[in-house]
Amino acid sequence: ALFSILRGLKKLGNMGQAFVNCKIYKKC
């Protein structure tokens, strides 16, 4: 169960990084 939670957090982290790149660095 813990592994799936960590994997989900990693996926959210990747989405968050893409959002930051889009908003701040204008890389969409």
Curated annotation (Swiss-Prot):
Annotated InterPro entries: Antimicrobial_frog_2
Short name of any one Pfam family annotated for the protein: Antimicrobial_2
Keywords: Amphibian defense peptide, Antibiotic, Antimicrobial, Disulfide bond, Secreted
Subcellular localization, as worded in the UniProt entry: Secreted
Keyword Signal: no
GO CC aspect terms: extracellular region
Disulphide bonds in the chain: 22-28
Alphabetical GO biological process terms: defense response to Gram-negative bacterium
The protein's role, per its UniProt record: Antimicrobial activity against Gram-negative bacterium E.coli.
Family: Belongs to the frog skin active peptide (FSAP) family. Brevinin subfamily.
Name assigned to this protein: Palustrin-1b
